[in-house]
Amino acid sequence: MAFLKKSLFLVLFLGLVSLSICDEEKRENEDEEEQEDDEQSEEKRGMWGSLLKGVATVVKHVLPHALSSQQS
């Protein structure tokens, strides 16, 4: 009977250890995915900022010429 108890405890312990390792790996994968999503969001924000700056520059140069053409 004692042998069965020890075997059962050993099986349960090994199962808990393996479950713990799997949970840890799952959390690491989720963290990596979140970091990738954050990096992609930052890249998109950077692209939008650059795009808006470019549009603003074009508008600054084109708008005065367009207004002076209309006044003539």
UniProtKB/Swiss-Prot annotation:
It comes from the Eukaryota. One of its GO terms (biological process) is defense response to bacterium. Keywords: Amphibian defense peptide, Antibiotic, Antimicrobial, Cleavage on pair of basic residues, Secreted, Signal. InterPro entries: Frog_antimicrobial_propeptide (IPR004275), FSAP (IPR016322). Residues 1-22 form the signal peptide. Expressed by the skin glands. Residues 24-45 are annotated as: Disordered. Residues 23-43 form a propeptide. It is found in: Secreted. GO terms for cellular component: extracellular region. The keyword Secreted applies. Residues 30-41 have a biased composition (Acidic residues). It holds the Pfam family FSAP_sig_propep. Belongs to the frog skin active peptide (FSAP) family. Possesses a potent antimicrobial activity against Gram-positive and Gram-negative bacteria. Probably acts by disturbing membrane functions with its amphipathic structure. This is Dermaseptin AA-3-4. It comes from Agalychnis annae.
